[in-house]
């Protein structure tokens, strides 16, 4: 029993320490001019098991791709942690900031904190951001 507790504690620390260092990040800009930010909240539809994450993306050169991964560790959700990902292949890259929705299907999230990781690939270059968000059930 002590070994299990120790393994759980070490797992949480392994995730929490590096995540804690990055939790203040709210906006990321690639060196080439692509930028992305994550909405503070994500909406979870409990009946459809889908999580909707909203982004603000600015890029140039045509069409880009946004990929989102959301991890919800224990104790926010049951053990083991919940992880899901989704993408939007139709990000408009015209130099203006656009709202971009990404839906994650098939993962069951609980209300509370979760960690979002976003990568945008665009003709104007990549952008990356990581941030703690709040999952709300509607």
Q: What residues fall within each predicted segment?
A:
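Ser/Thr-rich low-complexity repeats and stalk/linker segments
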Residues: 62-124, 133-137
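Bacterial N-terminal signal peptides
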Residues: 10-20
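Short, surface-exposed binding/anchoring microloops in extracellular/periplasmic proteins
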Residues: 33-76
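Bacterial N-terminal signal peptides that target proteins for export
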Residues: 1-11
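C-terminal region of N-terminal signal peptides and the immediate post-cleavage residues
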Residues: 19-37
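Short beta-strand segments
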Residues: 34, 127-133
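A broadly tuned, weak detector of single residues within folded domains
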Residues: 6-8, 21, 48, 111
């Amino acid at each position: 029993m002590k070994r299990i507790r120790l393994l759980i504690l070490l797992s949480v620390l392994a995730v929490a320490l590096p995540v804690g260092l990055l939790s203040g990040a709210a906006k990321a800009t690639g060196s080439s001019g692509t930028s992305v930010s994550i909405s503070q909240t994500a909406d979870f539809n409990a009946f459809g098991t889908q999580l909707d994450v909203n982004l603000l993306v600015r890029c140039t050169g045509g069409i880009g791709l946004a990929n989102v991964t959301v991890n919800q560790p224990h104790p926010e959700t049951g053990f083991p942690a919940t992880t899901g990902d989704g993408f939007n292949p139709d990000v408009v890259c015209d130099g203006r900031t656009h709202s971009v929705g990404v839906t994650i299907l098939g993962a069951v999230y609980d209300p509370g904190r979760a960690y979002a990781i976003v990568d945008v690939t665009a003709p104007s270059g990549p952008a990356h951001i990581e941030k703690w968000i709040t999952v709300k059930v509607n």
